[in-house]
Amino acid sequence: MTAPDLPFLQSDRIIFKLFACQEHLKNIKNIKLEHGDLLSKDARVKAEMEIDSLISQMIGTVDSLLFRIIDRFQLTGIQSDRIEIPAIISGLSAQSNGIELAKKLQDANLLGGSYWRFKDLRNYSLSGSLLSAEASLDVIPYFEQTLVQLKEFIKNIITNEPILQTKESQI
């Protein structure tokens, strides 16, 4: 694929990040098909790398959304290398047209919320493997479901905030 085939590579990083998530999930499925088990000696390292990459892209998808929110709502005082949901919530809450979005981000960031779960998953993967013989987690269906939840979260926010939409924003 070349850049002209994929115009969203330049214009919509949220869609690109979701595309990357789907590719990493597809790679995990292919590893399982090829080796029969993600825990096998030959598959384990590849599977771990793809899982870590998938988790990073999931967090990156939300980060891209946060960058767009900062840009489109013209939030000032938030450093691009220190983007945190609480700072964005504070900036949005100060604008009359950002209160509803601030509430959605607040809910997502609370314990058990969608963004909190993505961060918790990443934090867990920093200290341990999601792949283990003891774990009852079947990672492929889990990540399929998590990716659906991520898409729904992004779509819900973009659909309800026209200022965040792009011509490519068909999630």
Which residues does each predicted region cover?
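Acidic, Ser/Thr/Gly/Pro-rich intrinsically disordered interaction regions
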Residues: 1-56, 60, 64-171
